[in-house]
């Protein structure tokens, strides 16, 4: 594997996505046999990436980390901290490379974050969510939208919805404090959680990514089909941090 776009983590991942253009469906597939035996990771190969693709890739990296981070599994302090380090490193270095595309150190940091976010070390011993990836796969099955751009739309909206679920607020507030350096409001942790979402949206906007489906040219006409594809005709729920039906 020769890495040219830090995002999917294919250099150490056991996962891939299979697309069926006739049914407009995308399905994730994973096996230990998928992991590369050898990968070449040279940050210089990413210097010429367009800013939009750089931003999309960075959002995908953050999404891989957050799919594992948002979990109700207890006593996962070490993997929490590693995931937070991945997220804060991407946040810092994305702004650097968008300003200076040939910054070797910043490109290298993002590249390594992409690897660690998807080799599943941060998912060790904990339940993982994956609602947002499942949703984005179905959206991009119908519409021409970059994966990272779709995740930039779905993740903040998903977080905002979960602010209304009491069992989810503690972790959302922890994310806001540890990743975005928000001040913890112990009297109103939901307010802290919403501050983290606000700061995530700020990064997405600064990076030039869409925040709404309409910005990305996605209408409402396929919503029912997307939901049907996600739930396999309503036969199962989606997500572990919060189960959608």
Short names for language-model regions:
Residues 176-245:
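C-terminal charged capping/lid subdomain of soluble metabolic enzymes
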Residues 1-78, 170, 174:
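A glycine/threonine-rich phosphate-anchoring loop and its flanking beta-alpha core
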Residues 68-199:
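Active-site segments that bind and position negatively charged phosphate/pyrophosphate groups
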Residues 1, 40, 58, 131, ...:
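Alpha-helical architecture
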């Amino acid at each position: 594997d020769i890495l040219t776009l830090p995002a999917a983590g294919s250099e150490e991942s056991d996962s891939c996505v299979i697309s069926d253009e006739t049914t407009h469906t995308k399905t994730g597939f994973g096996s230990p046999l998928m992991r590369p035996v050898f990968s070449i990771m040279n940050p210089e190969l990413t210097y010429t990436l367009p800013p939009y693709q750089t931003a999309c890739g960075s959002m995908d990296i953050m999404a891989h980390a957050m799919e594992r981070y948002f979990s109700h599994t207890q006593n996962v302090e070490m993997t929490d901290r590693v995931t937070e380090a991945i997220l804060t490193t991407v946040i810092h270095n994305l702004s650097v490379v968008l300003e200076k595309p040939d910054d070797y150190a910043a490109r290298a940091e993002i590249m390594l974050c992409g690897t660690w976010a998807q080799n599943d070390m941060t998912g060790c011993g904990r339940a993982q969510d994956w609602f947002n990836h499942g949703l984005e796969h179905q959206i991009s099955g119908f519409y021409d939208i970059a994966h990272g751009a779709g995740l930039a739309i779905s993740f903040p909206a998903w977080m905002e919805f979960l602010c209304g679920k009491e069992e989810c607020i503690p972790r959302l507030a922890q994310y806001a404090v540890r990743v975005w350096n928000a001040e913890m409001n112990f009297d109103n942790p939901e307010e802290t959680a919403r501050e983290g979402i606000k700061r995530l949206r700020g990064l997405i906007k600064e990076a030039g990514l869409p925040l709404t489906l309409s910005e990305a040219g996605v209408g409402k006409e396929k919503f029912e089909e997307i939901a049907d594809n996600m739930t396999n005709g309503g036969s199962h729920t989606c997500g572990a941090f919060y189960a959608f039906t």
